Every structure is written in C-alpha cells, then in structure tokens.
Amino acid sequence: MLSILPLAYSNFSRILQYFEQLPVVDKMTEEILKQGVGIVETSLTFEPPFCESFERISIDNFPIFALGKEISKEDGIEAMKKYVTSRFWFTYRRDFSPIGGTGPSTDQGWGCMLRCAQMLLGEVLLRRHIGRHFEWDIEKTSEIYEKILQMFFDEKDALYSIHQIAQMGVTEGKEVSKWFGPNTAAQVMKKLTIFDDWSNIAVHVALDNILVKEDAITMATSYPSEDAVKLIMENGLVDKNRLSLSPGNIIPEWRPLLLMIPLRLGLTTINPCYLSAIQEFFKIPQCVGIIGGRPNHALYFVGMSGSKLFYLDPHYCRPKTESTAKMYAEKDSTATTDDVGFSHLEELVPLPSQTADVYTKMDDSTYHCQMMLWIEYENVDPSLALAMFCETRDEFENLCETLQKTTLPASQPPMFEFLQRRPKYLPKFEPYTGVSMKIEMKEFDDIGAANVKIDDDFEVLDVHTEEEDADEDNDDDVANA
C-alpha cells in the first residue's frame, strides 16, 4: 500500500480503481472503498476535506452567529448543524463534459474557489427567491428551489456552472484550470449575473479596501445597456428570451444588490486585531458569508463562535450529477433535443418531483453537507472577500448604518474604509453593465453573393510610379486644352 503513496498527487481516480479491485482486509481499505477519491485525498495529501465532524466539536461560546442568524445555547448545537446543512454545498465533480469542448472534465485540484463562489451565489439566490435562512427538507423541495439548483449543474448551458465560471475567468486573466483568488471570483460573479434576468441582481465589488456608498447605489440602480452583448446560443442565434435589462423593461428603481469587498487582513497571516470585526460581521442580517480559506485551499465561511469559523469545504470529489433535464428528455418521447441555450433557465424544465406519477424526488443530498466543520481564526488566510446582500434600498441603508456604528469600529484599524461619496482623486466610477459590443452577423450574410460587388463599399487606393503620374498629368492637360 505504501508503494502507491507517490501517485497520490497525480491521479486519485487510478488509486481508487486499484483499491476497488482489492478484498476488504482492514478498516482503512474499507473506508477508502466507502468514501472513494475524497478519502484517498484526505489520507494521502494531509489536506482533509473533513478535519472536524459535528460529533467532535465542543462549543463553549454562545450565541453562534451564522449569516446573520443568532443561534442561542437553548437552540443547541443541533440547530447550528441543521442551519449549515440547509446551505448549498458545491464540491469538486468529475466526469462532466470538457470545459470549452477540449478542456478538463473535472475541477479537482483547481476549482475550490469557483465552488465557494457557487455556494455564496447559491445563498444569495435562495434569499432572493425564497427568503432568508432557508431550511432544507430532504423529503420535500419546491419548484423554485429546484430551478435555483439547476443553475449550478455541471453543464455548459447552466448559467452558474463550473463551465461558465471558468470560462468567464479568462476575461480576468485566469486560464481555465487556474486557481482563483477571492477578488477574481467576485469579478466573475459580477459579470455572470448580468445574464440572469430572473434574479435581476446587481453585483458591486468594492476595491482598494474602500466602500463608497455612492458607487454602490449607482450600481444598484444601473441596468445593462441596450447594445450590451447578449447570450449567444450554440446555433449562433441570440437568445430572444434573454434581452437586456433596460429601464424601459424593468420599472423598479432598486435592483437587489450583492456587495463584495475583497480584503487582505495581513501580510502572510491574518492580523488578530480584526477578530472582533469578523465576529461583528457575521451578526449583520445582510451577511451572506466570506469566501477565503487557507493558502490555496478555498473555503466558504458561514458562521462564527468565539475564534472558531464554521465553513463549507469544496474539497470532496464526486461524480457529476445526472441532469434532471436529460432524465426527463429520455423518459418523455415528445421531448425535443434541440439546443435551447439558456432559455431553460427562464422556462422551468420539469423535474422529477413535479412529475411524481413517473419519477421519484430529485436526489439533491450531495448538495447539502451533513457535517459541521470549523477552523481557528488564526489559521485563516488573510486574503478574503466579505459578502452582503441587500434586497431593498432600506436594507442597504440599514447595512451602511451598521457598518459605520458597529462593524468597522470593532477593530483598529478598521477592516476597510467607508465613504459617503467618491473622492476627487479617484477616477469616475463606471458601473459594469455588460460589454457594449454586439456584432450583428446579418451584416455579413451577403458577402460572396453573385450580385454583390465587395469593392463598391471600399475606397480603392492605386499605387502609381512617378512616370505614370506624369503621363496622367499630360493626358489631363490635353483633355483640358
């Protein structure tokens, strides 16, 4: 067994296949066979995805605050476990369609921050469409819940899939399969939400440790321009179901705002002076967590008790979940196989739970973690991003007041600077409203047609020698005479 240890970092799936061929001779082999690649990774890399289980946690400091929810000693640790389990848990997956057609078919080893971004965004969508502090019921789900979950499936046509996030990262200078930092993840979320008409969320990323209230308001009241790039389906057509969000299309003045604040709270280790401020942050009703982790080991932080931060860990690899849309199409002989691009996000695809006479409930158990994990504050990487979600303008005003009166004064120096207006020394704030560069392919449809002279649309430049120019001048003189 020790002879295969050097292979651990290169190919976990081969190790798993090796063990599957062995008889169960001891407890460790049995555990590996049960947990698969995840346990092999845990045992051999010393970066266990589950460093502490619920049963081993001793909580001395109550109340616990999780994403703005207070859990008292009377509620007990079980209430916290249930709350953590109700959050979306997106982890490494394997065997999905190659990203970009020829790219990786698993995100194991590089996609942890992308998965944390998915978990954060999943929490935002739950609040947007269902409400705060969603409680998951393993026996029952709603259509809205399933629609949200579909948006994160590991498929190229799911809006918040690993495929879309990885490819959008290229616009931020990150090649596919390269590790993201918190700021890159925030920027990618800002760009992807532009295409989510259903949620209509604005994302503001505050840079340089400065939150300017005026800028956040501008972002929340801006809409993608009419000439912004539209989603292009694989057949080359613009998806007509997903037109731009313009003031003429949407009446409300305020778009629900996801506020992201990337920070670096120390050089190589997190500064102890910010502990109280982080504790206060998790008390804020608008808190939707922190994406950060350990160096090159991203985690999604959802709560805090004393110096312990509770988190969801994406470092657990599973096979790709079978698409419920594909399951339905295979069973329904009338289902079309045409590529519909992103339109299925607007027109809900029938899911198993909605066709109970034929199907059983969709198995979403792998998207919810049954264990509660924690890390000491001192072990957290100083590079992280705070996230807050304001459904209404009133919630945003309340958040600003809380930040100024409670959260920021809790540490000296404060975690970041809060300003009412943009300083004159900073360039003008330009809200991101999509890329204003839409090419109409029909303009090129007539190229090559028999009745089209391409040269007619261009100025023809002839190159003459000096002798030819002189001859032409003489000819002109003769003609004029």
UniProtKB/Swiss-Prot annotation:
Function of the molecule: Cysteine protease required for autophagy. Cleaves the C-terminal amino acid of ATG8 family proteins lgg-1, to reveal a C-terminal glycine. Exposure of the glycine at the C-terminus is essential for ATG8 proteins conjugation to phosphatidylethanolamine (PE) and insertion to membranes, which is necessary for autophagy. Its cleavage activity is functionally redundant to atg-4.2, but it cleaves lgg-1 precursors more efficiently than atg-4.2.
Region (Disordered): 462-481
EC id: 3.4.22.-
GO biological process: aggrephagy; autophagosome assembly; mitophagy; piecemeal microautophagy of the nucleus; protein processing; protein transport
Enzyme class: hydrolase
Outcome, altering H129P: In bp504; defective degradation of pgl-1- and sepa-1-containing protein aggregates in comma stage embryos. Reduces cleavage, but does not impair lipidation of lgg-1
GO MF annotation: an example: protein-phosphatidylethanolamide deconjugating activity
Family: Belongs to the peptidase C54 family.
UniProt keywords, alphabetically: Autophagy, Cytoplasm, Hydrolase, Protease, Protein transport, Thiol protease, Transport
Reaction it catalyzes: [protein]-C-terminal L-amino acid-glycyl-phosphatidylethanolamide + H2O = [protein]-C-terminal L-amino acid-glycine + a 1,2-diacyl-sn-glycero-3-phosphoethanolamine
Organism of derivation: Caenorhabditis elegans
PANTHER family in the cross-refs: CYSTEINE PROTEASE, CYSTEINE PROTEASE ATG4
Membrane-spanning ranges: none
Record's protein name: Cysteine protease atg-4.1
Gene: atg-4.1
Keyword Hydrolase on entry: yes
GO cellular component terms, semicolon-separated: cytoplasm
InterPro entries according to UniProt: Papain-like_cys_pep_sf (IPR038765), Peptidase_C54 (IPR005078), Peptidase_C54_cat (IPR046792)
Domain of life where this protein originates: Eukaryota
Active-site residues (renumbered): C112 (nucleophile), D313, H315
Pfam families: Peptidase_C54
Compartments, record wording: Cytoplasm
